[in-house]
């Protein structure tokens, strides 16, 4: 098969090219630079900065300082948007699981992503932080035009975010529709609950 994005065939493109096209992903287990601060983690994302070359490091220090100031300002705006500005100077390794998920979401904001794949964003996250993450995702979608593809098992989280919903099992699509339609689908019930449990529920 082929994968297209805005009409362009992106099948087989390497990760760095997908990144530059605005296609990003987060991971079920968050990956961060443990010993760096939350703000520094965000400032690392854009890449291709002037300070990366020895020539600029010696002869264009003013440009480097200006770029760093701009990145710092943008990182602080992202942290404010995500309601974790108070953690800017905290070591990323000290964050909770949910806070690390917010940090990963913040990374996508540093490069103005177009499409973001979220892999099991609710895994290991308490309910309060999960709803904070959901609110941030909704705002990014509605206010900034981000598109999210959410891979998730938490039905409350899906209900808050997703329309339509696609249910898959063993690599194939079982059903597509609203969450209510998915929950009522016979194939979905059988695949995830089993025929025995389905029949038991019907008798009860």
Task: Go through the PLM ranges and name each one.
Residues 116-119:
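Catalytic Walker B motif of ABC-type/P-loop ATPase nucleotide-binding domains
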Residues 52-87, 114, 135-138:
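Conserved ABC ATPase "signature" region
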Residues 91-95:
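Conserved ABC ATPase signature
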Residues 131-143:
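Helical segment within the ABC ATPase nucleotide-binding domain
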Residues 158-160:
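A short, surface-exposed alpha-helical micro-motif characterized by mixed small hydrophobic
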Residues 1-8, 20-21:
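Conserved ABC transporter NBD signature motif
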């Amino acid at each position: 098969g082929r994968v297209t994005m805005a009409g362009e065939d992106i099948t087989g493109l390497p990760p760095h090219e997908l990144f530059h096209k605005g296609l990003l992903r987060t991971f079920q287990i968050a990956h961060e630079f443990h010993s760096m601060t939350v703000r520094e983690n965000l400032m690392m994302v854009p890449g291709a900065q002037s300070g990366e070359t020895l020539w600029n490091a010696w002869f264009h220090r003013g440009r480097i300082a200006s770029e760093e100031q701009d990145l710092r300002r943008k990182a602080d705006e992202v942290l404010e948007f995500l309601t974790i500005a108070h953690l800017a100077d905290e070591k990323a390794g000290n964050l909770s699981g949910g806070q690390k998920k917010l940090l990963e979401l913040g990374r996508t904001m540093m490069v103005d992503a177009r499409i973001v794949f979220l892999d099991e964003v609710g895994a290991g996250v308490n309910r309060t932080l999960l709803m904070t993450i959901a609110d941030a995702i909704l705002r990014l979608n509605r206010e900034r035009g981000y598109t999210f593809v959410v891979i998730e098992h938490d039905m409350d989280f899906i209900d808050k975010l997703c329309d339509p919903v696609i249910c898959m099992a063993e690599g194939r699509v079982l059903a597509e529709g609203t969450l209510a339609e998915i929950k009522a689908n016979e194939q979905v019930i059988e695949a995830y609950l089993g025929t025995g449990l389905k029949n038991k529920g019907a008798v009860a």
